[in-house]
Amino acid sequence: MKATDLFHVTVLVAGALALEHQQPLIGDLSQDLNHIIDSSPLLSFHRALVQIPSISEHEKNVGEYVLDFLSSQNLTVEKQIVTPESDTEEERFNIYAYVGKNRQPDVLVTSHIDTVPPFIPYSLHAPTSDTSFIRTDLVIAGRGTVDAKASVAAIVFAALETLDENPNASIGLLFDVGEENSGVGMKHFSNSELNPTPPTYHTVIFGEPTELSLVAAHKGTLGFKLVAEGKAAHSGYPWLGESAISSLIPVLAHLDTLQDLPPEKGGLLRSETLGKSTLNIGRVHGGIAANVVPAHAEAAISVRLAAGTPEDTRTIIERAVAKVTSGDRSVYPDFGDRKAGAPPQYFDVDVDGFEVITVNYGTDAPALKIHDQRTQRVKRYLYGPGSILVAHADNEAITVGELEEAVRGYKRLIAASL
């Protein structure tokens, strides 16, 4: 790839980055803020991504934008259709890009283009009420500014700059759909011809908000329902029925203590790296009216696994339920597909110059089957700009400085992997 083919992206970004040490901005604030974004291809691309709503199952428009942009940079771009595996008829697709005919590159860099609801419009904010500030402190707010359109934008420009400096760099880009609710995009890629055995890539770099640190590990996941079956009756004669809600409550109360119980006493598993497994009772519903003894009740529960497998945790849950119910099957855990869930994930952190942390959230990483060989292990890195603490919140936001630093961080990871 030639520098001219990139529409001078590298030169423009370098110029924008050089502004980092300029004097504080004073003047027409709104004009200054928009000028900062307009003058940077990176920030302009990020703005365009965020301005296009892409809540899970509705990623088509932002996907088309990313596809067109990558094509304009002389990359070979494929649209990997995943619609038949979804609950919506709207077209859904992953975007897979690479240089020339190098369809199976050495290094795969990936993130997701879907977001959680609701859509929050893009906006710019000075870091303080004062009109004087440094451009790198400018705050960019809106849904997806962090999770994960910041990673998408930084990955794209890190790849373009790398290819401008080294046209033979063997890099592939994957931007998938559905990470926030089902993992359908990564699962589809994982089961496709683009993920062969043995693997053609030797490194995968996952883009998620990590506060610009390398992640050593993140917790696994397990979701299930606790179900109680009772018998309906008039509330004036409750002894004629069996309240499913009353049966559910003591079991829920016990499950809620498992994260604090030591494993040897029936509690959830722990590890030195990730600490305690945690359990969250996220939703409870049951009954049809206040004057009817409820015949059915259930709770939706999520466990973040610090150790062991999902099956290990299922066993702990089953034993805990049986302890309270004395084996009464009118209250039971419903795990659905027992193949669902994921164990804790561990990543490589052997590139110098990064802080190393662990995180409690989940990613697409377990959905990508890594076909390690006896003589070659595929390395996995997890890195990205922004904080998970605001990623799904009303105040989701990132600074210009974080976004620009992420480009440099991804370039270092790519360079170390080539």
Curated annotation (Swiss-Prot):
Main location: secreted
InterPro entries per record: ArgE/DapE_CS, Bact_exopeptidase_dim_dom, Peptidase_M20, Peptidase_M20_dimer, Peptidase_M20A
Note on how the cofactor is bound: Binds 2 Zn(2+) ions per subunit.
Signal peptide: 1-18
Key words of the record: Glycoprotein, Hydrolase, Metal-binding, Protease, Secreted, Signal, Zinc
Binding positions (Zn(2+) 1): D147, E180
Enzyme's top EC category: hydrolase
EC number: 3.4.17.-
Bilayer-spanning residue ranges: none
List of residues binding Zn(2+) 2: D147
Residues carrying covalently attached carbohydrate according to the record: N74, N168
Active site: E179
UniProt GO BP: proteolysis
Pfam families assigned: M20_dimer (PF07687), Peptidase_M20 (PF01546)
Annotated localization: Secreted
Cofactor(s) required for function per UniProt: Zn(2+)
GO-annotated cellular components: extracellular region
Molecular function in Gene Ontology: metal ion binding; peptidase activity
Family named by the database record: Belongs to the peptidase M20A family.
Protein name: Probable carboxypeptidase AFLA_000940
